[in-house]
A protein has these predicted regions:
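N-terminal amphipathic/basic-hydrophobic helices that include classical n-h-c signal peptides
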Residues: 1-9
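Active-site-proximal or metal-binding-adjacent scaffold patches in catalytic folds
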Residues: 11-44, 133
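Alpha-helical ds-nucleic-acid-binding substructure associated with the helix-hairpin-helix region
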Residues: 30, 34, 63, 67-141, ...
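Short, aromatic/basic-rich helix-turn unit that serves as a nucleic-acid recognition element
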Residues: 53, 57, 61
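Catalytic DNA-binding helix-loop module of base-excision-repair DNA glycosylases/AP lyases
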Residues: 58, 131-176
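Short, charged, surface-exposed loops that flank catalytic or proteolytic processing sites
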Residues: 181-187
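Conserved small/polar residues in nucleotide/adenosyl-binding loops
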Residues: 212-215
Length: 215
């Protein structure tokens, strides 16, 4: 069994993953080989919502390796802090952000996020009290924050259990590989298959991605 570590995971002391995989296997026996091949830990929450959304923007449409390097260099700008607050970010010159590898659109997007967090500070502190759909509706009001970015926030920050980002390319590739499809599945095809995985679709977003690393 290959054990894969995602960002923001912890040892599954409470058995969340075990419970989820048992349910998923009962709902979809074809997943047996996947669960025998891959082992993942439980998700752990991220308390800094601003950091989480900025990170997802940096990772948009980039490989994990490339995005990780850019995000590391970005954080080094603010060496005295573990992560800048929205005001610090807005004070940072465009050229400084550009120098670490951020594109101009992404610089504008994270500035939009910073401005929105300043304006809606109290509202955003209570995001976890909202439903998944309410959070998507609220955060996608920010220019540059699309459904995928919010889905990453729901999964890796709030640890919501039933998120399935059908537009994620790595997930689509893993889905194609595991189910031995000739072509990349459409978002509709993935959504139809994923119906049987409710209410644990988040974990079925992680397993296929891990599977691609083994092939």
């Amino acid at each position: 069994i290959a054990v894969y570590k995602f960002m923001f995971v912890k040892k599954d002391k409470m058995g969340t993953v075990k419970k989820a995989t048992q349910y998923l296997l009962k709902s979809d026996p074809e997943l047996y080989e996947l669960f025998e091949t891959i082992d993942i830990d439980a998700l752990s929450p991220e308390k800094n919502y601003f950091k989480s959304i900025c990170r997802s923007i940096v990772y948009q449409q980039l490989s994990g390796k490339s995005a990780g390097k850019i995000f590391f260099r970005f954080k080094k700008i603010y060496s005295e802090k573990s992560f800048p607050d929205p005001i610090d970010l807005l004070k940072t010159k465009h050229a400084t952000l550009k120098a670490v590898g951020l594109s101009s659109p992404k610089i504008n997007y994270i500035r939009n996020v910073a401005q929105s967090f300043i304006k809606n500070k109290n509202k955003y502190l209570k995001l976890n009290e909202l439903s998944d759909s309410q959070i998507i509706e609220e955060l996608t009001k920010i220019k540059g924050v699309g459904p995928w970015t919010v889905q990453m926030f729901l999964m890796f920050t709030l640890n919501r259990l039933d998120v399935f980002p059908t537009g994620d390319l790595a997930l689509r590739k893993g889905f194609q590989l595991y189910f031995k499809l000739d072509d990349l599945p459409t978002e509709k095809e993935m959504a139809i298959r994923a119906e049987r995985w409710k209410p644990y679709r988040t974990y079925m977003s992680l397993y296929p991605v891990s599977y691609t690393h083994l092939r």
